[in-house]
């Protein structure tokens, strides 16, 4: 299936996302913040990036902008998985290049459905 980069400063959230997507057949690599994610994205190609917004060192909006500046990630789906649900933040994410927005806490089936949809995979 897909190679997914999951970015969140919460270890429990990274574990839950990884568990959910691995059980759906995907390979998941975790990063603890935007800087860690950018380093991993430079070393390996991912089919999708799933990132929190509020993180230390580099937030998810900045990460999205930085990834979009890299040719291999210009068209890679980037989903924001966050507690932020305000319209202003969503617009900021979209302007940075985010493909979609999932609000925490998430339903595992919803996460799998959204990931499958943006990757063009059958569910």
Ranges and model annotations:
Residues 15-23:
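Charged docking surfaces used in two-component/phosphorelay signaling
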Residues 45-47, 72-77:
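His-Asp phosphorelay/catalytic-motif detector in bacterial-type signaling
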Residues 55:
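Receiver (REC) domain active-site loop signature in two-component systems and cognate sites
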Residues 106-115:
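C-terminal output helix
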